[in-house]
Amino acid sequence: MRATLTRAVTFSAAHRYRRPEWDDARNREVFGACAHLNWHGHTYTCEVTVGGEVDPVTGFCADLGALDRALAERVVAALDHRNLVLDVPAFAEGALIPTGENVAWWIAREVQAALGPSTRVERVRLSEMPGLWVEIVPA
């Protein structure tokens, strides 16, 4: 039997959307207020769902302690109270634009790397504010 387990964490971070090869006018046209040169921030809520076969001995589908450590060490420690563009190499200017989709994908990759192959990241849901979220399902 397979099951899933979801844990939610929060973190606060600043970012902006910008393509360095575009001028300011083009960035504003495409990204709107998210392209503001002086940044903007969110208090994100991130839900990570992992899944696996239920262990007949423990009754667990995943090691919650390992998931909590992965979220604390690979996500919250890396992103909380950070400027995503300046502090996280994956989102440096000219690399990935720190959209909700890209941040969620990055989180999925980081958590999966920490958990190893026995537990699979099934879904990441990332909310920038009430009423706005992105959900990714890693392939």
Where are each of the predicted segments found?
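Charge-rich, low-complexity N-terminal segments
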Residues: 1-139
